[in-house]
UniProtKB/Swiss-Prot annotation:
Residues 212-289 form the TFIIS N-terminal domain. It comes from Debaryomyces hansenii (strain ATCC 36239 / CBS 767 / BCRC 21394 / JCM 1990 / NBRC 0083 / IGC 2968) (Yeast). Residues 41-56 have a biased composition (Acidic residues). It is found in: Nucleus. PANTHER family: PROTEIN IWS1 HOMOLOG. The gene is IWS1. GO terms for molecular function: chromatin binding; RNA polymerase II complex binding; RNA polymerase II-specific DNA-binding transcription factor binding. Residues 1-19, 320-332 have a biased composition (Basic and acidic residues). Transcription factor involved in RNA polymerase II transcription regulation. May function in both SPT15/TBP post-recruitment and recruitment steps of transcription. It comes from the Eukaryota. This is Transcription factor IWS1. Residues 22-34 have a biased composition (Polar residues). One of its GO terms (cellular component) is RNA polymerase II, core complex.
Length: 404
Protein backbone atom coordinates (compact mmCIF):
# COMPACT_ATOMS: atom_id res chain seq x y z
CA UNK A 1 0.00 0.00 0.00
CA UNK A 2 1.40 3.34 -1.04
CA UNK A 3 1.86 6.34 1.23
CA UNK A 4 -0.99 8.22 -0.44
CA UNK A 5 -3.46 5.40 0.14
CA UNK A 6 -2.34 5.15 3.76
CA UNK A 7 -2.95 8.85 4.39
CA UNK A 8 -6.42 8.61 2.84
CA UNK A 9 -7.34 5.63 5.02
CA UNK A 10 -6.02 7.40 8.12
CA UNK A 11 -8.05 10.52 7.33
CA UNK A 12 -11.22 8.47 6.82
CA UNK A 13 -10.70 6.63 10.10
CA UNK A 14 -10.25 9.85 12.03
CA UNK A 15 -13.26 11.42 10.38
CA UNK A 16 -15.39 8.41 11.37
CA UNK A 17 -14.13 8.67 14.96
CA UNK A 18 -15.01 12.36 15.12
CA UNK A 19 -18.51 11.78 13.74
CA UNK A 20 -19.10 8.98 16.25
CA UNK A 21 -17.83 11.21 19.05
CA UNK A 22 -20.32 14.02 18.36
CA UNK A 23 -23.23 11.66 17.85
CA UNK A 24 -22.76 9.64 21.05
CA UNK A 25 -23.37 12.40 23.59
CA UNK A 26 -23.60 16.15 23.85
CA UNK A 27 -21.12 16.19 26.75
CA UNK A 28 -17.46 16.34 25.76
CA UNK A 29 -15.35 13.28 26.61
CA UNK A 30 -11.84 13.60 27.89
CA UNK A 31 -9.39 11.73 25.71
CA UNK A 32 -5.76 12.40 26.29
CA UNK A 33 -6.62 15.79 27.77
CA UNK A 34 -9.53 17.97 28.98
CA UNK A 35 -12.05 19.56 26.59
CA UNK A 36 -11.70 23.33 26.42
CA UNK A 37 -13.74 26.22 25.02
CA UNK A 38 -11.51 28.24 22.69
CA UNK A 39 -11.15 29.73 19.27
CA UNK A 40 -8.40 28.41 17.07
CA UNK A 41 -6.49 31.51 15.98
CA UNK A 42 -4.23 29.54 13.62
CA UNK A 43 -7.10 28.33 11.43
CA UNK A 44 -6.92 28.88 7.69
CA UNK A 45 -8.60 31.89 6.06
CA UNK A 46 -11.03 29.69 4.15
CA UNK A 47 -12.39 28.22 7.38
CA UNK A 48 -12.67 31.69 9.01
CA UNK A 49 -14.98 33.13 6.34
CA UNK A 50 -18.58 32.77 7.45
CA UNK A 51 -21.75 34.46 6.34
CA UNK A 52 -22.81 37.69 8.06
CA UNK A 53 -25.93 36.14 9.55
CA UNK A 54 -23.90 33.28 11.02
CA UNK A 55 -21.27 35.66 12.51
CA UNK A 56 -23.93 37.53 14.42
CA UNK A 57 -25.09 34.34 16.15
CA UNK A 58 -21.69 32.62 16.83
CA UNK A 59 -20.36 33.42 20.26
CA UNK A 60 -18.13 30.36 20.96
CA UNK A 61 -16.43 27.54 19.14
CA UNK A 62 -16.06 24.23 20.94
CA UNK A 63 -12.90 22.32 20.02
CA UNK A 64 -12.00 18.69 20.73
CA UNK A 65 -8.57 17.18 20.29
CA UNK A 66 -8.36 13.70 18.81
CA UNK A 67 -5.07 11.91 19.08
CA UNK A 68 -3.67 10.43 15.91
CA UNK A 69 -1.37 7.50 15.27
CA UNK A 70 1.79 7.16 17.21
CA UNK A 71 3.72 6.96 13.95
CA UNK A 72 2.65 10.34 12.67
CA UNK A 73 2.57 11.82 16.17
CA UNK A 74 0.15 14.62 15.28
CA UNK A 75 -3.19 15.70 16.58
CA UNK A 76 -6.27 16.80 14.66
CA UNK A 77 -8.53 19.42 16.22
CA UNK A 78 -12.20 18.95 15.36
CA UNK A 79 -14.29 22.08 15.93
CA UNK A 80 -17.98 22.33 16.60
CA UNK A 81 -19.65 25.71 16.11
CA UNK A 82 -21.97 26.39 19.02
CA UNK A 83 -24.54 28.93 17.87
CA UNK A 84 -26.21 30.82 20.65
CA UNK A 85 -28.70 33.63 20.49
CA UNK A 86 -28.01 36.91 22.24
CA UNK A 87 -29.25 37.12 25.72
CA UNK A 88 -32.33 39.27 26.13
CA UNK A 89 -30.55 41.68 28.47
CA UNK A 90 -27.72 42.27 25.99
CA UNK A 91 -30.20 42.72 23.17
CA UNK A 92 -32.26 45.17 25.25
CA UNK A 93 -29.21 47.24 26.19
CA UNK A 94 -28.08 47.44 22.58
CA UNK A 95 -31.57 48.42 21.48
CA UNK A 96 -31.84 51.12 24.16
CA UNK A 97 -28.53 52.60 23.04
CA UNK A 98 -29.90 52.88 19.51
CA UNK A 99 -33.06 54.53 20.82
CA UNK A 100 -35.38 52.02 19.21
CA UNK A 101 -38.41 50.62 21.01
CA UNK A 102 -40.25 47.82 19.21
CA UNK A 103 -44.00 47.79 19.02
CA UNK A 104 -44.18 44.63 21.10
CA UNK A 105 -42.72 46.33 24.14
CA UNK A 106 -44.37 49.70 23.64
CA UNK A 107 -46.99 50.27 26.38
CA UNK A 108 -49.31 51.71 23.77
CA UNK A 109 -49.50 48.31 22.08
CA UNK A 110 -50.08 46.18 25.15
CA UNK A 111 -46.50 45.78 26.44
CA UNK A 112 -46.00 42.18 25.29
CA UNK A 113 -42.82 40.35 26.26
CA UNK A 114 -40.85 38.71 23.44
CA UNK A 115 -38.00 37.36 25.55
CA UNK A 116 -38.83 33.75 24.63
CA UNK A 117 -39.25 34.46 20.95
CA UNK A 118 -37.29 32.58 18.34
CA UNK A 119 -34.12 34.52 17.34
CA UNK A 120 -34.88 34.46 13.63
CA UNK A 121 -38.48 35.54 14.19
CA UNK A 122 -37.33 38.32 16.52
CA UNK A 123 -34.79 39.51 14.01
CA UNK A 124 -37.38 39.57 11.24
CA UNK A 125 -39.93 41.38 13.42
CA UNK A 126 -37.47 44.04 14.54
CA UNK A 127 -36.35 44.63 10.98
CA UNK A 128 -39.94 45.14 9.83
CA UNK A 129 -40.66 47.51 12.71
CA UNK A 130 -37.53 49.54 11.97
CA UNK A 131 -38.51 49.84 8.34
CA UNK A 132 -42.06 50.92 9.21
CA UNK A 133 -40.86 53.50 11.75
CA UNK A 134 -38.29 54.87 9.31
CA UNK A 135 -40.88 55.21 6.55
CA UNK A 136 -43.40 56.90 8.85
CA UNK A 137 -40.88 59.32 10.32
CA UNK A 138 -39.53 60.30 6.91
CA UNK A 139 -42.96 60.92 5.42
CA UNK A 140 -44.08 62.97 8.41
CA UNK A 141 -40.94 65.09 8.32
CA UNK A 142 -41.31 65.61 4.60
CA UNK A 143 -44.94 66.61 5.00
CA UNK A 144 -44.13 69.12 7.73
CA UNK A 145 -41.35 70.59 5.66
CA UNK A 146 -43.65 70.94 2.66
CA UNK A 147 -46.29 72.63 4.78
CA UNK A 148 -43.74 75.03 6.20
CA UNK A 149 -42.46 75.83 2.74
CA UNK A 150 -45.99 76.43 1.46
CA UNK A 151 -46.87 78.72 4.35
CA UNK A 152 -43.61 80.59 3.94
CA UNK A 153 -44.29 81.08 0.24
CA UNK A 154 -47.79 82.37 0.96
CA UNK A 155 -46.50 84.79 3.60
CA UNK A 156 -43.83 86.09 1.24
CA UNK A 157 -46.41 86.58 -1.47
CA UNK A 158 -48.76 88.51 0.84
CA UNK A 159 -45.91 90.67 2.18
CA UNK A 160 -44.78 91.53 -1.34
CA UNK A 161 -48.33 92.48 -2.35
CA UNK A 162 -48.75 94.57 0.79
CA UNK A 163 -45.60 96.54 0.00
CA UNK A 164 -46.82 97.13 -3.54
CA UNK A 165 -50.22 98.34 -2.32
CA UNK A 166 -48.70 100.77 0.19
CA UNK A 167 -46.32 102.09 -2.45
CA UNK A 168 -49.19 102.60 -4.93
CA UNK A 169 -51.30 104.39 -2.30
CA UNK A 170 -48.43 106.76 -1.45
CA UNK A 171 -47.84 107.53 -5.12
CA UNK A 172 -51.52 108.34 -5.63
CA UNK A 173 -51.44 110.68 -2.63
CA UNK A 174 -48.43 112.50 -4.07
CA UNK A 175 -49.99 112.79 -7.52
CA UNK A 176 -53.29 114.03 -6.08
CA UNK A 177 -51.55 116.66 -3.97
CA UNK A 178 -49.72 117.85 -7.11
CA UNK A 179 -52.96 118.05 -9.11
CA UNK A 180 -52.22 115.02 -11.27
CA UNK A 181 -54.42 112.00 -12.03
CA UNK A 182 -53.94 109.15 -9.51
CA UNK A 183 -53.98 105.84 -11.40
CA UNK A 184 -51.44 103.67 -9.55
CA UNK A 185 -54.06 101.83 -7.50
CA UNK A 186 -56.19 101.13 -10.56
CA UNK A 187 -53.23 99.49 -12.29
CA UNK A 188 -52.74 97.09 -9.37
CA UNK A 189 -56.45 96.48 -8.64
CA UNK A 190 -56.84 93.24 -10.64
CA UNK A 191 -53.94 91.56 -8.85
CA UNK A 192 -55.23 92.65 -5.43
CA UNK A 193 -58.74 91.35 -6.14
CA UNK A 194 -57.30 88.05 -7.38
CA UNK A 195 -55.45 87.54 -4.08
CA UNK A 196 -58.33 88.63 -1.85
CA UNK A 197 -60.78 86.29 -3.60
CA UNK A 198 -58.75 83.13 -2.86
CA UNK A 199 -60.16 81.25 0.13
CA UNK A 200 -56.93 79.34 0.84
CA UNK A 201 -55.06 82.64 1.39
CA UNK A 202 -57.59 84.11 3.84
CA UNK A 203 -55.61 83.17 6.97
CA UNK A 204 -52.34 84.47 5.50
CA UNK A 205 -54.05 87.72 4.48
CA UNK A 206 -55.31 88.35 8.00
CA UNK A 207 -52.14 87.19 9.77
CA UNK A 208 -49.90 89.42 7.63
CA UNK A 209 -52.24 92.41 8.16
CA UNK A 210 -53.02 93.02 4.50
CA UNK A 211 -56.13 94.87 5.71
CA UNK A 212 -53.88 97.81 6.59
CA UNK A 213 -53.05 98.26 2.91
CA UNK A 214 -56.76 97.89 2.06
CA UNK A 215 -57.52 100.70 4.53
CA UNK A 216 -54.99 102.96 2.81
CA UNK A 217 -56.67 102.27 -0.53
CA UNK A 218 -60.15 103.12 0.80
CA UNK A 219 -59.15 106.32 2.60
CA UNK A 220 -60.10 109.64 0.95
CA UNK A 221 -57.40 111.49 -0.98
CA UNK A 222 -55.86 114.78 0.24
CA UNK A 223 -58.41 116.86 -1.73
CA UNK A 224 -61.25 115.05 0.16
CA UNK A 225 -62.21 113.09 -2.95
CA UNK A 226 -63.22 109.45 -2.68
CA UNK A 227 -61.24 106.68 -4.40
CA UNK A 228 -62.45 105.32 -7.71
CA UNK A 229 -65.81 103.58 -7.48
CA UNK A 230 -64.31 100.38 -8.87
CA UNK A 231 -61.80 100.32 -6.00
CA UNK A 232 -64.54 100.90 -3.42
CA UNK A 233 -66.78 98.21 -4.86
CA UNK A 234 -64.16 95.47 -5.27
CA UNK A 235 -62.42 95.95 -1.92
CA UNK A 236 -65.57 96.32 0.18
CA UNK A 237 -67.17 93.25 -1.41
CA UNK A 238 -63.97 91.26 -0.80
CA UNK A 239 -64.18 92.10 2.92
CA UNK A 240 -67.46 90.19 3.19
CA UNK A 241 -65.67 86.91 2.40
CA UNK A 242 -62.79 87.21 4.89
CA UNK A 243 -63.27 85.85 8.46
CA UNK A 244 -62.32 89.14 10.13
CA UNK A 245 -62.12 89.15 13.94
CA UNK A 246 -61.80 91.91 16.52
CA UNK A 247 -58.00 91.58 16.68
CA UNK A 248 -57.74 92.14 12.93
CA UNK A 249 -59.94 95.24 13.16
CA UNK A 250 -57.78 96.73 15.92
CA UNK A 251 -54.51 96.01 14.10
CA UNK A 252 -55.64 97.35 10.71
CA UNK A 253 -58.01 100.19 11.68
CA UNK A 254 -60.25 99.45 8.71
CA UNK A 255 -63.40 99.82 10.82
CA UNK A 256 -62.95 103.61 11.02
CA UNK A 257 -62.85 103.92 7.24
CA UNK A 258 -66.04 101.89 6.84
CA UNK A 259 -67.80 104.06 9.43
CA UNK A 260 -66.85 107.04 7.27
CA UNK A 261 -68.39 105.30 4.25
CA UNK A 262 -71.50 104.54 6.28
CA UNK A 263 -72.05 108.18 7.29
CA UNK A 264 -70.99 109.78 4.04
CA UNK A 265 -73.68 111.01 1.64
CA UNK A 266 -71.45 110.35 -1.36
CA UNK A 267 -71.43 106.58 -0.85
CA UNK A 268 -73.47 104.67 -3.40
CA UNK A 269 -76.73 103.26 -1.97
CA UNK A 270 -76.06 99.57 -2.69
CA UNK A 271 -72.52 99.90 -1.40
CA UNK A 272 -73.78 101.54 1.77
CA UNK A 273 -76.00 98.52 2.45
CA UNK A 274 -72.96 96.25 2.28
CA UNK A 275 -71.06 98.57 4.62
CA UNK A 276 -73.96 98.60 7.10
CA UNK A 277 -74.08 94.81 7.12
CA UNK A 278 -70.31 94.57 7.65
CA UNK A 279 -70.32 97.03 10.54
CA UNK A 280 -73.26 95.20 12.11
CA UNK A 281 -71.46 91.86 11.87
CA UNK A 282 -68.25 93.30 13.35
CA UNK A 283 -69.83 95.24 16.22
CA UNK A 284 -72.26 92.53 17.29
CA UNK A 285 -69.61 90.35 19.06
CA UNK A 286 -68.11 93.43 20.71
CA UNK A 287 -71.50 94.46 22.15
CA UNK A 288 -72.40 90.84 23.01
CA UNK A 289 -75.50 90.93 20.84
CA UNK A 290 -77.03 87.94 19.13
CA UNK A 291 -77.67 87.85 15.39
CA UNK A 292 -80.98 86.03 15.92
CA UNK A 293 -84.13 88.06 15.27
CA UNK A 294 -85.82 86.37 18.23
CA UNK A 295 -83.30 87.90 20.63
CA UNK A 296 -83.75 91.39 19.21
CA UNK A 297 -85.06 94.01 21.63
CA UNK A 298 -87.22 96.80 20.20
CA UNK A 299 -87.60 100.13 21.94
CA UNK A 300 -91.19 101.43 22.19
CA UNK A 301 -92.37 104.97 22.82
CA UNK A 302 -95.79 106.62 22.95
CA UNK A 303 -96.85 108.40 19.78
CA UNK A 304 -98.48 111.82 20.03
CA UNK A 305 -99.46 113.18 16.66
CA UNK A 306 -99.55 116.86 17.60
CA UNK A 307 -96.24 116.80 19.44
CA UNK A 308 -94.56 114.84 16.67
CA UNK A 309 -95.81 117.34 14.05
CA UNK A 310 -94.39 120.27 16.00
CA UNK A 311 -91.05 118.51 16.47
CA UNK A 312 -90.89 117.61 12.78
CA UNK A 313 -91.56 121.17 11.61
CA UNK A 314 -88.94 122.62 13.96
CA UNK A 315 -86.40 119.96 12.93
CA UNK A 316 -86.93 120.75 9.26
CA UNK A 317 -86.31 124.43 9.88
CA UNK A 318 -83.12 123.81 11.85
CA UNK A 319 -81.84 120.92 9.72
CA UNK A 320 -78.82 121.83 7.58
CA UNK A 321 -78.86 121.27 3.87
CA UNK A 322 -77.89 117.73 2.92
CA UNK A 323 -74.82 117.12 0.84
CA UNK A 324 -75.54 116.13 -2.72
CA UNK A 325 -74.50 112.82 -4.16
CA UNK A 326 -72.11 112.45 -7.08
CA UNK A 327 -75.01 111.82 -9.44
CA UNK A 328 -76.85 114.94 -8.27
CA UNK A 329 -73.69 117.03 -8.57
CA UNK A 330 -73.07 115.82 -12.12
CA UNK A 331 -76.71 116.50 -13.07
CA UNK A 332 -76.55 120.00 -11.62
CA UNK A 333 -73.30 120.67 -13.44
CA UNK A 334 -74.91 119.64 -16.75
CA UNK A 335 -78.06 121.60 -15.83
CA UNK A 336 -80.17 118.49 -15.91
CA UNK A 337 -82.78 117.13 -13.56
CA UNK A 338 -81.65 114.30 -11.32
CA UNK A 339 -83.84 111.29 -10.69
CA UNK A 340 -84.72 111.16 -6.98
CA UNK A 341 -82.81 108.40 -5.26
CA UNK A 342 -84.21 106.32 -2.44
CA UNK A 343 -82.81 107.15 0.96
CA UNK A 344 -81.91 104.41 3.39
CA UNK A 345 -83.88 105.09 6.57
CA UNK A 346 -83.62 102.94 9.66
CA UNK A 347 -86.24 103.23 12.41
CA UNK A 348 -85.00 102.34 15.87
CA UNK A 349 -88.08 103.27 17.96
CA UNK A 350 -91.49 101.66 17.43
CA UNK A 351 -94.68 103.56 18.35
CA UNK A 352 -96.59 102.34 21.36
CA UNK A 353 -100.31 102.03 20.66
CA UNK A 354 -103.01 102.23 23.36
CA UNK A 355 -105.66 99.54 22.67
CA UNK A 356 -108.32 101.40 24.70
CA UNK A 357 -107.88 104.49 22.53
CA UNK A 358 -108.41 102.42 19.41
CA UNK A 359 -111.61 100.95 20.83
CA UNK A 360 -113.00 104.41 21.65
CA UNK A 361 -112.22 105.67 18.18
CA UNK A 362 -113.90 102.65 16.66
CA UNK A 363 -117.07 103.12 18.74
CA UNK A 364 -117.35 106.81 17.89
CA UNK A 365 -117.06 106.16 14.18
CA UNK A 366 -119.35 103.12 13.98
CA UNK A 367 -122.45 105.17 12.98
CA UNK A 368 -120.85 106.94 10.08
CA UNK A 369 -119.15 103.78 8.95
CA UNK A 370 -122.41 101.85 8.91
CA UNK A 371 -124.20 104.42 6.72
CA UNK A 372 -121.27 104.61 4.35
CA UNK A 373 -121.10 100.84 4.14
CA UNK A 374 -124.81 100.64 3.29
CA UNK A 375 -124.51 103.17 0.47
CA UNK A 376 -121.52 101.38 -1.05
CA UNK A 377 -123.23 98.02 -0.76
CA UNK A 378 -126.42 99.28 -2.46
CA UNK A 379 -124.37 100.78 -5.25
CA UNK A 380 -122.51 97.52 -5.87
CA UNK A 381 -125.70 95.43 -5.88
CA UNK A 382 -127.37 97.78 -8.36
CA UNK A 383 -124.35 97.57 -10.64
CA UNK A 384 -124.48 93.78 -10.57
CA UNK A 385 -128.24 93.78 -11.35
CA UNK A 386 -127.71 96.00 -14.37
CA UNK A 387 -125.03 93.67 -15.69
CA UNK A 388 -127.32 90.67 -15.42
CA UNK A 389 -130.29 92.41 -17.07
CA UNK A 390 -128.21 93.69 -19.94
CA UNK A 391 -127.43 90.15 -21.05
CA UNK A 392 -128.98 89.31 -24.44
CA UNK A 393 -131.71 86.69 -24.46
CA UNK A 394 -132.91 84.58 -27.39
CA UNK A 395 -132.59 81.17 -28.95
CA UNK A 396 -129.23 79.55 -28.78
CA UNK A 397 -127.38 77.85 -31.57
CA UNK A 398 -128.59 74.48 -30.37
CA UNK A 399 -132.22 75.69 -30.61
CA UNK A 400 -132.93 76.06 -26.92
CA UNK A 401 -135.73 78.48 -25.91
CA UNK A 402 -137.07 78.39 -29.46
CA UNK A 403 -140.88 78.77 -29.75
CA UNK A 404 -142.58 77.06 -32.68
Amino acid sequence: MSDKEGETALYNDREEEARQFFSDSAEPQSQGGSNELAVNENEDNNNDEVEDDADENIYSIQAHKITGDEENNREVTMKKNVRKAKKYDEFKNERDEQGFVPMGENPEYGGMDYSNEDPQARKRRLLEEKMESAIKSKTSRRRRADEDDLERMQDDRIDFLKDQMIKAANLDVEKNSQGQIATEKLKLLNEVVDILSKADLAISILDNNLLEAVRLWLEPLPDASMPAYQIQKELIHSLTVLPIKTDHLIASGIGKVLVYYQRSKRTEANLKKVVDRLIGDWTRPILNKSDSYKDRTIQFNEYNKNRFTNQLSSARRSKPKEAKSLYEESAERRKRAAIPAARTTAYKIAPKVDPSLLRRQQLNSNGNNDERFKRINQKLTSMNFKKKSSKKSGPSIEGRNLTI
